[in-house]
Every structure is written in structure tokens, then in C-alpha cells.
């Protein structure tokens, strides 16, 4: 069971290695998450928006790609949280969560966020899965170009779990055409299978007989994306052949059919 299909999973489904059931409806009472892409010049407006959401009784996530400051110019979670606590969100209960914290500290922070005592949670991708806080309505992802489509889709799924309108804002100053295209895919689509399809186009399915989960397959002629209908027909024919082989006692009977 996967809430976030990855390219290789999608490829396996196309080639018939997996049977699937698709649940493509939102649970009752939930609204579609509004997603936007902005650059860092919008930070001040974002902070004001978060304050309004908190004043309305909601909570927010702010996700950073790093735990601590390094050689890059990316925003580290700990330093960023300190800046926000002493600046834009002074006086608002703010928590920090990342993978380098011990279990008790992480549990204490999450308990505070779940209870509503912590209004803003600055975190790394540790919140990507297994976090369910219906009262959280805002997800801000800093340096969003550093994340893949599957991760972005998972992170966005942390909000939109309650009845209030939820928002996901992808912040990026990247000039990379590939990165910008990836973020626009997130803005355009909310369906995980459509996002996986676009991810498949960008990254490829990987090896069919190896262990690479991305990259172009070593096929000389066939293209799984443009030949999807042909693949489905081939799968149906192969299934029919296997059924005949199992039900016919000899190859001669099979040939006659």
C-alpha cells in the first residue's frame, strides 16, 4: 500500500508485476490543498499569513532540508527556528523537530504539537510520514528544489487532514529549469498517480532486472511512456496465454486453440 507512488512502482504496475486498486477520492469533509510556488522575497508575507492562520486556531509546519548549518546556503532547521522564535514569530510557541534529536525529545515536541500547545513546528523530513495533526493547515517547504516529487507530495500530505482549508507553499530561489518544472508539477497536480507519472517522465523507471530505482531503462526501441496502450495489450495477451497453458493438457491442444 502506497500513498505516494514512486516512478519504479508505477513502472512495475504498467508492466504487470503488481495489481492495483486506486483510491482517488478525498475522505469526507476534506478540501483540496492549495499549493503555490514563491521565492524568498515572499517570506514576510508568508509569516503574516501564518500568523493569521494561528490566530484562527490553526497550526503550521515549516520544513527545512538541513538540521544544522553547513557549507551550503540552505536554511538549517535549528538556526532558522531560532531566528523565527526571536523575530517574526516572537511570542508564539514554536518547536523544532529533526532526526538528530533523541527519542524522548522528539516525542515531547510532537506531543506538544499534537496537543496544540506548539503552534509552529520547524522540522526536517522526519515529518514526512506517520504524522497526523488535523489542526495543521499550513505547510511551508523551504529550499523546495532540494526535494523530489515523492517527498514533496508526502510533506504536503501532512496538512489537509482536517475540515479547514489547507495550504502548501513551496519556497525556492532556484534558477534550474528542471527544479522549477518539478515545483510547477506540484502546484498543478494533487493526484499522487499523476505526480508519479510526471516523476517517471523526469527520472525514468530504473532497471527492470536490476536494483536501480530511477534512470532510463536499457531499451533500444520500446518506450513505456508512449507505448502504454501496447503494454496493456501485451499484458492481456500474456495472461491469456498463461491461462491456456494451465488449462490445456498438452501443447498440441494449446496450438489448436
Where are these regions (language model features)?
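Post-DEXD/H (motif II) to motif III coupling segment of the RecA-like Helicase ATP-binding lobe
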Residues: 1-34, 41-51
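C-terminal helicase module of SF1/SF2 nucleic-acid helicases/translocases
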Residues: 43-59, 78, 82-86, 90-248, ...
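Flexible beta-alpha connector loops of hexameric P-loop NTPases
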Residues: 32-41, 71, 144-145
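Glycine- and acidic-residue-enriched helix-capping/strand-helix junction motifs
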Residues: 70-80
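A short beta-strand-to-loop transition that corresponds to the Sensor-1 phosphate-sensing loop
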Residues: 1-5, 16-17, 65-66, 124-126, ...
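Inter-lobe coupling/hinge region of RecA-like P-loop helicase motors
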Residues: 30-38, 64-66, 92-105
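Glycine/Thr-rich phosphate-binding loops of Rossmann-like dinucleotide-binding domains
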Residues: 8-9, 70-71, 131, 149
Amino acid at each position: 500500500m502506497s500513498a505516494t507512488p514512486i516512478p519504479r512502482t508505477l513502472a512495475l504496475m504498467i508492466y504487470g508485476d503488481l495489481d492495483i486498486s486506486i483510491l482517488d477520492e478525498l475522505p469526507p469533509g476534506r478540501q483540496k490543498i492549495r499549493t503555490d510556488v514563491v521565492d524568498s522575497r515572499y517570506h514576510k508575507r508568508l509569516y503574516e499569513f501564518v500568523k493569521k492562520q494561528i490566530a484562527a486556531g490553526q497550526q503550521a509546519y515549516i520544513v527545512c532540508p538541513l538540521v544544522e548549518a553547513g557549507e551550503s546556503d540552505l536554511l538549517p532547521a535549528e538556526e532558522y527556528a531560532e531566528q523565527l522564535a526571536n523575530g517574526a514569530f516572537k511570542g508564539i510557541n514554536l518547536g523544532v523537530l529533526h532526526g538528530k534529536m533523541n527519542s524522548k525529545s522528539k516525542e515531547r515536541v510532537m506531543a506538544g504539537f499534537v496537543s496544540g500547545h506548539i503552534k509552529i513546528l520547524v522540522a526536517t523530513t522526519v515529518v514526512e510520514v506517520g504524522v497526523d495533526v488535523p489542526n495543521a493547515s499550513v505547510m511551508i517547504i523551504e529550499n523546495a528544489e532540494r526535494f523530489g516529487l515523492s517527498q514533496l507530495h508526502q510533506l504536503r500530505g501532512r496538512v489537509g487532514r482536517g475540515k479547514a482549508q489547507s495550504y502548501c507553499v513551496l519556497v525556492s530561489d532556484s534558477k534550474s529549469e528542471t527544479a522549477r518544472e518539478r515545483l510547477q508539477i506540484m502546484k498543478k497536480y494533487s493526484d499522487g498517480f499523476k505526480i508519479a507519472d510526471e516523476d517517471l517522465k523526469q527520472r525514468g523507471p530504473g532497471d527492470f532486472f536490476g536494483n536501480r530505482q530511477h534512470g532510463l531503462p536499457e531499451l533500444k526501441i520500446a518506450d513505456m511512456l508512449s507505448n502504454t496502450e501496447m503494454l496493456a495489450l501485451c499484458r492481456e495477451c500474456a495472461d491469456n496465454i498463461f491461462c491456456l497453458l494451465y488449462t490445456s493438457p498438452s501443447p498440441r491442444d494449446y496450438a489448436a486453440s
